[in-house]
Each structure stands twice: as C-alpha cells, then as structure tokens.
C-alpha cells in the first residue's frame, strides 16, 4: 500500500516536471569521441557523517574510476558526476531524482545511502527505467526483492541472511538463550538489523532461541545503559549487539569492561554488515591487522593515546564479530585509499568545497566508503562488459542491469552479485588469536534454503576459546546468573562431619571450661531466679490514663444510702493518694505503682523483697514486685479500687455508724498484728494514706518493707502527724523503730475514723463510743511501754460488738435493704401514674394510626409497605365551602367543621371504615385496609356515604340557619399500597391509581350525589345485587383518565321512597346535557395520601388536586 502511494506521488511529480521541462532550452551537445556517462549521486552531508557522510566517503568515487582505468576498464568512457545532498529525506530524494532524470539525463543513480530513501528512489527509477546502485544503510530485507525493485542493485547482503547465519552459529555452539542490544540512531539501521535477526530466531524452521532481553542503548546516556547492562547481567551471558560507527563499537567495549562483563562467562557477538570486523578505518599510521589491513578497534582515534587501549583490548578478547567477508586482497591499495580519500573529494572532478568537506577529519575514513568504492567499481565493470558500439545500448536498462550479475575483488572483499541483484551472503565469524590478530573462525554461506557453515579449525578449545581457558562458555552458567546455584563443594558437603570431628578433639577442653562455668552460672542463675521472683520488667508496665479517683462510682453503695448516724461531715482535707500512686497495667491487670529514687540495693534488701512476695493476709495489700531497670525504682502492689482510707474520709459525703467504724479499725489492727509477727517486725510508715480499701470495704495495709527506699518527691511535713514522738525526737530510721511506734500511728488513724476529720480532732466527736475512744487514748500514750500491743488491741475490740455483727458487708447490705423498702411504695405510686399516661398515649396513637401499625411502631419494629388487592376509597367535599367560609368568622368556620366531622366520625365507627385524614372541607376514608374484609368494603363505604348524605340534609348551621350543607362524594374500588412514611410524626399513607381515580370521581361529581366508577359499581352489583338503587351517568371526560362511564348511587332500595319526579331532578339525563368543563390530563405522577399531618411537596395530594380542579372549573365557567 505504501509503495503504491509513493509510486502515485512520483508519477504526479514526474508528470508536472515533464511539462515544465518542455519549456527548457535545448542544451544538447554533439557527441564526443568518448561516451560521457552521467552519474547522479544522492548523498548525505550531515546525516550519520562518520558512516555515510559525503566528506569522508565521496572521495571513493573518483578513486574507483582511477582504479578501473588501471585495470583496463572504462577506457572508452568519460564520467560526469551530479551530486545532490538529499540527507535521506524522502521529499528531497523525489526532487533530486526528477532533476537527475529529466534535467541532467543521468545514466545511473547512486544512493541515497538510507533504506527508506532508497526505496523512494527505486520506485522513481523504475518509472523512468534507470538503474540504481545502493550503498550504506541499505541491508533491509525487502530491498532484495527483485520484483518490487527490478533496477536496484546493492553490494550489501540483507540483514535477514545475517540472522540465519547467527542462528546457525548458535546451533554450532549449542546456545539457546541470548540478549540483543543495539545503539540508537535516527535512521534506525541497527534497529532494522535486530528486527530481521529476531525474525529469523522466531522462524519455525530455525532452532528455538530464547531472547530474554532486547534493548536500545545510547552513546551518551550512561544512566539508561547502566540499567540495561544490569538487567542483562542477571538474565543472559550470550549477547548480540550492533553499532553503526567505530566510536559506538569502542564505546560498547569500554562499557562492558566497566560493568564487569568481560569474565569467562560472557560472549559478546557483534552483528555487522560493513566488512570491518575488529578493525577501524583510520589513516593515523597505527598498526593494522594483517588479515584486513584495518587498524584494531582498541587503538585510539587520535594520534596519541586515551588511556583506554588496555581496557578495550581486554574487552575485545570477549568479543566475536559476525560480518560480511572482509578479507581484502590488495591491502596496500586499501591503505592508499584510507590516506587519500578525503583529499580526493576536495580535488577534481568532485571539487567539494562545502564546510563539511573542508573541515572533515582527515584521519578516519567513512564507515561505508569502501562500499561506495565497490558500487562505482561494479558499475564500471558492467559498462565495460556491455562492450557495444551503439551509444543507445548504455541507456537501455534491460541491457545494462544484467551486466551487474558479476564478481570482482573489491575493497570489501570478494564481491559476488546474485541474480536478485544483491551481494551473495557470505558471512564470516571473526575472533582474536593468541597474537591478538583477527582470524576467521567460520564461514557461513546461504544456498537457498539452507545456511551452510564451514569451520576453519579442527580443535575448538584452543582456536576459539583461547582467552576463555580453552572452555566454551554456557548460555546459562552453572551457578546461575546471580551465582546462587553453584554445586556444593567437598568441604561444604562434608562440613558438618568435619566440624564434628574437630569438636571431638577439643571436647575435653570444652568440658573442663564448661565445668568451671557451670558452677559460676548456677550461682548466677539461682540469684537471677530469686531476683525474678520480685523484679518486674519495666517494659511490662504500661501507663494508664485512668486515675484512682475515677473509681468514685464504685462507692455508690454507701454514698447513696440514707444517713444512719449524725455527725460532722465537713472534712476538707484532700487526700494525697493520687499523688503517691499511679495506676498501670501489668500482665493485663490494673496495679498500683509508687516511684522511689534510684539507690543501691543490698543483699538484705533483695532477700526482704523475696519474703515480702510471700506475705499473704486479708488485711495486707500484696506486694507484687519492684522495677529496677528504669530511671526510678517502681514498687508494684495490688490495686484497691476504692482508694486510701484518707481519701474516703476526706470526701465525707456519706455517714458511718458505729459498726462501720469498728470494722475499719479492726482491719487496721489485724493487719498490724500480722506484720508484727513477721520478719518485718513493724510497718514503719503507717498512716491513713497507706491504708487502702478494696471493693469489699476491706482495709489493706500498704507501703510496708520499703525501709531503705527514698521517695521520688520530698514527703510533706503533714505526714509527721502520724509519727510517734520518740521517732521524731530521735530521727530514727525504720530499722531502729519499735512496734510501739506503729501503735501510735494506729491511734491517729482510729481518731480520724471516729471524727471523720484530720488527726487530733477526736474531742469534737459527739457519738457515744467511749470504749473505742478509751482504746485510742491508750494507743497514743506518750511512753511507748504504756501502749498496748497489736494483739491486745485485737482482743479488746472483740468485746466491743455483739457476735452477731462481725461482717461489714452484711451490715452494708442491711442498710441497703432498709433503704429499698422505703422506695417500694414510691415506685408503686409512680407505676400507677405511668400506666394511666400510657393508656392515654395509646388512645391518642390509635386515633392517628391503625391499631396494628401503632403496635408495631411501639415495639420498635419497622412497618413494611403492604399491598391490598381490593379496597374502596372514599372522597368527599363540602359544596360551595368557600362561599360558606366567607360568611363566617374563622372561629365559626372551625366550629362548623368540628360539628360536622364529629358526627361523621361517629358514622365511620358504626360502619367499620378507616378514616385516613381530613384537610379543610375534604374528607378521605378507606375500607378494606389495614384489615382485609373481603368485598364488604364497597358496602361499608356506600352505606357510610348514604348516612353522610342523610345527616347533611338535617344538619343546620347555627349562625346561618338558611344555609344548607351539601356534600359531593366520589367512590372507587381497586388495588392500592399502604405503608408508614417518615420517622418523625409517621404517617399512614395510601399509594396507587385507585386513590387518584376516587378523587377524580369526587371532583367531577354533583352536589348531594354519590359518584361511582364502573369498577366500584360492578363490585357493588356483583356482591350486593338488588340492594342499592343506581343509575348510569353515561360517559364523562375525566382528567388524566379520558372518557369513563360512571354511575350514581341514589340509596338503598328498601329506603327509597321519594317520587319519580324527585329522581328525575337528581339524576342527569345524559352527559351531553352537562356543561362540565374538564382541564387537560396531567402528566403521570406518584399518588399517595396519608393518615395524618401536612403533605410534603413530593407526595401527590388528591384532595389538593381535586380542589384545584374545582377552582379551575369555576374560572372557566366565569
């Protein structure tokens, strides 16, 4: 498709150019003795200058002509060269081609040196039958298609053949996993080569090749290149790569060396179509390969060195080149060509004077200059072989093109052109020998459809893998790409056995060492085990925001109880319980902690803590342990949720009777008695703040045994109130104190309990508890020997109360029972009042909602919408109510409707009909829901309607005795849906077209008549035949429904007694005689009515709709 478009564009362009050329003057000159051959050259000046630039390649053209004449060719021809710098641009190529053919009338076109541009030139040449010779980056496979390009000849094999040669090479060396890298360029030469090679690898006819990575790298982008090489290192060891210039080739070798990819595992195979292999085309006079006559790639491109020679040379030993046969027979002339090619382009007949030609590097020949030489040489050989005296023969493309099928020794080796006008694909695999000379290791020749290989060595190891230790690398290393799968060595395999053997030798020494260590460690272990009994790791203590005071609610049992005794309750002392203790979590339980300054713990202290852990008494707060691995010592004890005794007494918001005080004092005395009998001998820090109270109102002594620990904060002087006088005078430590000091502290605590005030306030107590007071006075005697012991205190207290009252909790429960009995009568009184109010609320609720719905709502249940197959809906409206209301004051209007609807409500209750709502003079009722009643609903509604009419005839307005009240009633039967809508002020609503139609019956009815739909009339006659007197009204246009036949109900048959004349007055004759104006039908809408409250705007209101309809009717009538 693309080629067809190009041909069309070329045809249009050539037609225009032919028309334009007809007006040019005739410049034809008489033929000379020698035939002048005009050669059009489409060159590139600034595109890939180092490879195909005219400044470094163009000199090959005159030098090829000179070489042809040396060998006796083209003696009868002169040459004229027309050079156009198309820069591989397709538009420029078309222009240049037309000028070559039409204006300059060239005999042959050389170039352009790019694949896509060459295709355009070939299409143009085919149209004008001109031969085209290709060189440069023209190895694309499709250029070898002689059918598409019959006049195109190239001296380069196509890259598809290179892919077959690469596939054959992988088969020879048993490789199947490869990576493919190539340098980026604008003309995408290497990209095309790699695509063709990849296509051959994926061809089913070739052995399977796994391409693990294919990536593009950049000459000056080291960051991207680093990422690519890191990926290659982890996935492949056989790497195909492609470059366009010698600079890129040398850059690649430097990069693999810097990335440590030149080890014995890596094989780098360069794919080339330039006949250069390991060489570079320079004229610096540096050493050359004897095989190709080119300078080795590791030599710098300057006259000096660049310090990379050694690195590149080492990297080249891991490199192979798969290239077109590059062995040049005449290496001297190749050297001459390299030295003089830049001079030749500037000299006649080229005479290139552009900036590029004048400033070109004179040391490096263009990469594809030798191909340009061979192209010109091929054309000269073809001209000579034509050997015709007829000048017109040389213009006949069908004669000259077959002469291109020939062979000769060129500057790119032996050139053999096949019948498809491309060079015969003869590839060679080049490597370096031990002398760093380029040698051919294998030759690949394609004989359709097989790629044959001829090895140039007998022994592979030394010839091919000399630099690899004579061993062929694997495409997958034995140890894997990351070195994690290496086989286990002998030492690694038997390491455990060797270690065991060595261990046996030194076992005796180890046993001796262990024996000594065991004695030491056992001692330390025993010490650690002992310490672990009382040590609490600080990490196991978690702070809690909850404070002891938050447990005040736990004391509600006594705080809420009535007062049992009278006394002072104005204690204002604030407890320091929360200041002394902190609540924390330890092993998922709340505990109390107290901080002490860090100090040295003696062995006696540690032994004391172990024994304290074992203390167990109901009036001793259990010591859990001590944390010593933080900045402070933290003592951990069991939590008493009611706080300290001082904290309870300081609040003073409940009363304590004699027995309550007795039990608390007794618990303190029992705790002291237990401590005085233990190894501790005494408490030493007894005060009301260290007497803790648990949930059962049981007192437990805390902060005992902390003799040598100093509190974190300086204790307030207030604590000295509980210290015995002899301790204050002598500044005694706990270890120097006697148990009598605790007795003194006990007396102070007892006085606090008795007075519910601070210490030393016992004289203000007015209750009669002389025995306890006498005991307290004995305990705070000045002389320690006069104070009773803790055991004596307990024995004396046993006789202060009767044996029946020994438990404080029983006493508390008795107090609560007395309080409960006083509440029962009050509760019974309140219950009666609540029952009465509940009945009133139920009555009010039943008037607002159906009973079943109300019961579900009271139970907290949701009321799901319910569908009813058959119900009868009733609508009524007071006729001319607006006129009546205008004659009444607002209060008279309300009284009028109240009198009327109160009697209507009585009639409704008599007929089992549910009243949904009434708004203004509108009235809505329904029968058949929420309790289904079969088909009795039509009878109930009709009977109720007749009763309404009967009542209205006798109803008189007190303040308007001459005015009568008339109703207009509409009835319809059918299905509907009912449900509760809303949460605040819920409403029982009806939904369905049945409701709307009933409203239309009312609004289209007549005063004092009952208007029925055909459905309601059929239901009435079907189930209650001969019960009611009805008549057809005829067909009426109903808003939103169209034409409907409706009916009148005049009364029950047994009740009708009016004369026929009255019937004829009330019964309309036909619809045609009625002047009834009907508004247009409304749009479909959701219709619903509710049982209570005002309607939201989103819910359809039949009452409002039929009232609006009535007002619209009046407006039209006026």
Curated annotation (Swiss-Prot):
Query: Is Glycosyltransferase among the key words of this record?
Result: no
Q: Which family does it belong to?
A: Belongs to the adenylyl cyclase class-4/guanylyl cyclase family.
The family database entries (SUPFAM superfamilies) matched by this protein are listed as: Nucleotide cyclase, Periplasmic binding protein-like I, Protein kinase-like (PK-like)
TM spans (from-to): 495-515
Q: How does it sit in the membrane?
A: Single-pass type I membrane protein
Please list the tissues where expression of this protein has been recorded: Expressed bilaterally in AWA and ASI sensory neurons and in RIA and PVT interneurons.
Any one GO CC term of the record: plasma membrane
Q: Which GO terms describe its molecular function?
A: ATP binding; GTP binding; guanylate cyclase activity; peptide receptor activity; protein kinase activity
Q: What is this protein called?
A: Receptor-type guanylate cyclase gcy-2
Mapped to this chain, the residue ranges on the Extracellular side of the membrane are 22-494
What sequence ranges are listed for the domain Guanylate cyclase? 872-1002
Q: What Pfam families does the record tag this protein with?
A: ANF_receptor, Guanylate_cyc, PK_Tyr_Ser-Thr
Q: Which residues form the signal peptide?
A: 1-21
What residue stretches are annotated with the Protein kinase domain?
A: 558-875
**Which InterPro entries does UniProt cross-reference here?**
A/G_cyclase, A/G_cyclase_CS, ANF_lig-bd_rcpt, Cyclic_nucleotide_synthase, Kinase-like_dom_sf, Nucleotide_cyclase, Peripla_BP_I, Prot_kinase_dom
Which cellular compartments is it found in?
Cell membrane
Please state what class of enzyme this protein is. Answer: lyase
Swiss-Prot/TrEMBL domain comment: The protein kinase domain is predicted to be catalytically inactive.
Q: Membrane side Cytoplasmic: which residues? A: 516-1118
Q: Which GO terms describe its biological process?
A: cGMP biosynthetic process; intracellular signal transduction; receptor guanylyl cyclase signaling pathway
Q: Keywords of this protein's UniProt record, alphabetized?
A: Cell membrane, cGMP biosynthesis, Glycoprotein, GTP-binding, Lyase, Membrane, Nucleotide-binding, Receptor, Signal, Transmembrane, Transmembrane helix
Q: List the disulfide bonds.
A: none
Glycosylation sites noted in the Swiss-Prot or TrEMBL record: 222, 351, 361, 387, 420, 452
**Location of region: Disordered:** 1076-1103
Q: What EC number is given for this enzyme?
A: 4.6.1.2
| Reactions accelerated catalytically | GTP = 3',5'-cyclic GMP + diphosphate
């Amino acid at each position: 498709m693309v080629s067809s478009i190009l041909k069309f564009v070329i045809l249009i362009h050539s037609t225009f150019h032919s028309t334009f050329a007809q007006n040019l003057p005739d410049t034809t000159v008489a033929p000379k003795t020698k035939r002048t051959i005009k050669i059009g050259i489409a060159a590139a000046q600034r595109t890939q200058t180092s490879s195909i630039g005219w400044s470094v390649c163009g000199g090959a053209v005159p030098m090829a002509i000179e070489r042809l004449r040396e060998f006796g060719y083209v003696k009868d021809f002169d040459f004229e060269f027309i050079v156009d710098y198309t820069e591989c641009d397709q538009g420029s190529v078309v222009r240049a081609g037309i000028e070559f053919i039409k204006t300059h009338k060239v005999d042959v076109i050389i170039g352009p040196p790019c694949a896509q541009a060459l295709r355009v030139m070939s299409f143009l040449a085919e149209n004008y039958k001109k031969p085209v010779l290709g060189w440069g980056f023209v190895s694309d496979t499709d250029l070898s298609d002689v059918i598409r390009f019959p006049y195109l000849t190239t001296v380069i094999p196509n890259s598809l053949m290179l892919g077959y040669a690469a596939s054959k090479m992988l088969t020879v060396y048993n490789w199947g996993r490869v990576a493919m890298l190539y340098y980026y360029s604008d003309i995408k030469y290497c990209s095309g080569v790699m695509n063709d090679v990849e296509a051959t690898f994926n061809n089913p006819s070739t052995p399977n090749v796994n391409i693990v990575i294919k990536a593009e790298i950049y000459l000056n982008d080291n960051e991207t290149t680093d990422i690519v090489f890191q990926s290659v290192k982890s996935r492949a060891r056989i790497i195909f790569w492609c470059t366009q210039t010698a600079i890129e080739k040398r850059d690649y070798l430097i990069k693999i060396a810097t990335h440590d990819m030149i080890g014995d595992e890596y094989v780098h195979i360069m794919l080339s179509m330039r006949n250069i292999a390991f060489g570079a085309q320079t004229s610096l006079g540096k050493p050359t390969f004897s095989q190709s006559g080119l300078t080795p790639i590791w030599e710098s491109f300057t006259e000096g060195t660049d310090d990379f020679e050694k690195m590149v040379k080492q990297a080249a030993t891991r490199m192979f080149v798969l290239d077109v046969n590059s062995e040049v027979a005449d290496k001297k002339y190749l050297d001459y060509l390299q030295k003089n090619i830049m001079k030749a382009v500037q000299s006649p007949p080229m005479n290139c004077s552009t900036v590029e030609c004048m400033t070109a590097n004179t040391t490096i020949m263009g990469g594809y200059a030798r191909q340009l030489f061979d192209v010109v040489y091929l054309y000269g050989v073809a001209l000579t072989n034509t050997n015709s005296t007829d000048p017109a023969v040389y213009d006949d493309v069908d004669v000259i093109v077959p002469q291109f099928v020939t062979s000769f020794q060129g500057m790119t080796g032996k050139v053999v052109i096949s019948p498809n006008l491309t060079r015969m694909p003869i590839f060679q695999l080049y490597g370096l020998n031990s002398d760093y000379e380029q040698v051919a290791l294998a030759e690949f020749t394609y004989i359709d459809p097989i790629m044959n290989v001829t090895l140039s060595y007998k022994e592979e190891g030394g010839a091919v893998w000399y630099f690899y230790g004579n061993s062929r690398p694997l495409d997958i290393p034995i140890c894997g790409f990351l070195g994690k799968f290496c086989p286990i060595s002998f030492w690694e395999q038997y390491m455990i056995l060797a270690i065991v053997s060595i261990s046996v030798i030194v076992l005796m020494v180890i046993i001796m060492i262990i024996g000594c260590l065991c004695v030491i460690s056992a001692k330390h272990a025993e010490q650690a085990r002992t310490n672990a009994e009382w040590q609490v790791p600080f990490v196991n203590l978690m702070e809690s925001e909850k404070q002891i005071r938050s447990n005040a609610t736990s004391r509600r049992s006594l705080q809420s109880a009535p007062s049992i005794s009278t006394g002072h309750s104005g204690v204002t002392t604030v407890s320091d319980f929360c200041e002394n203790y902190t609540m924390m979590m330890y092993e998922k339980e709340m505990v109390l902690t107290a901080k002490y300054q860090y100090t040295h713990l003696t062995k006696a202290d540690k032994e004391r803590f172990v024994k304290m852990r074992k203390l167990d008494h109901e009036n001793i707060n259990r010591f859990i342990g001590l944390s010593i691995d933080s900045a402070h010592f933290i003592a951990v004890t069991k939590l008493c949720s009611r706080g300290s005794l001082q904290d309870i007494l300081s609040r003073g918001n409940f009363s304590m009777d004699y027995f309550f005080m007795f039990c608390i004092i007794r618990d303190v005395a029992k705790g002291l008695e237990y401590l005085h009998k233990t190894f501790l001998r005494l408490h030493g820090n007894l005060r009301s703040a260290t007497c803790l109270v648990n949930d059962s109102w049981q007192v437990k002594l805390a902060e005992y045994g902390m003799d040598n620990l100093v509190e974190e904060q300086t204790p307030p002087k207030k604590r000295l109130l509980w210290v015995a006088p002899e301790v204050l005078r002598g500044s005694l430590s706990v270890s120097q104190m006697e148990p009598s000091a605790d007795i003194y502290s006990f007396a102070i605590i007892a006085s606090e309990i008795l007075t519910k005030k601070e210490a030393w306030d016992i004289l203000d107590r007015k209750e009669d508890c002389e025995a306890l007071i006498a005991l307290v006075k004995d305990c705070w005697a000045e002389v320690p020997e006069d104070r009773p012991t803790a055991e004596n205190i307990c024995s004396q207290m046993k006789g202060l109360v009767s044996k029946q009252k020994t438990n404080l909790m029983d006493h508390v429960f008795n107090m609560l029972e007395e309080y409960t009995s006083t509440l029962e009568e009050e509760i019974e009184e309140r219950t009666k009042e609540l029952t009465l109010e509940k009945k009133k609320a139920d009555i009010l609720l039943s008037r607002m909602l159906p009973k079943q719905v109300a019961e579900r709502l009271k139970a907290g249940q949701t009321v799901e919408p319910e569908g009813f197959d058959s119900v009868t809906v009733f609508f009524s409206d007071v006729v001319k109510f607006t006129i009546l209301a205008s004659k009444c004051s607002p209060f008279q209007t309300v009284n009028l409707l109240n009198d009327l609807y109160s009697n209507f409500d009585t009639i409704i209750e008599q007929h089992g009909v549910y009243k949904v709502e009434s708004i203004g003079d509108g009235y809505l009722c329904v029968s058949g829901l929420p309790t289904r009643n079969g088909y009795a609903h039509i009878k109930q509604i009709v009977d109720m309607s007749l009763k309404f009419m009967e009542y209205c005839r006798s109803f008189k307005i007190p303040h308007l005795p001459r005015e009568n009240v008339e109703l207009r009633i509409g009835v319809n039967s059918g299905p509907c849906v009912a449900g509760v809508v809303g949460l605040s002020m819920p409403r029982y609503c009806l939904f369905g077209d049945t409701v709307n139609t009933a409203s239309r019956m009312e609004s289209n009815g007549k005063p004092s008549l009952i208007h029925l739909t055909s459905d309601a009339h059929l239901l009435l006659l079907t189930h209650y035949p001969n019960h009611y007197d009805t008549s057809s009204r005829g067909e009426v246009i109903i808003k939103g429904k169209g034409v409907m036949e409706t009916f009148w109900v005049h009364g029950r048959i047994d009740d009708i007694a009016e004369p026929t004349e009255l019937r004829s007055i009330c019964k309309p004759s036909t619809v045609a005689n009625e002047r009834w104006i009907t508004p247009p039908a409304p749009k479909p809408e959701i219709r619903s009515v509710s049982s209570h409250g005002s309607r939201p705007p989103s819910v359809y209101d039949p009452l409002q709709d039929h009232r609006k309809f009535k007002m619209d009717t009046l407006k039209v009538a006026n």
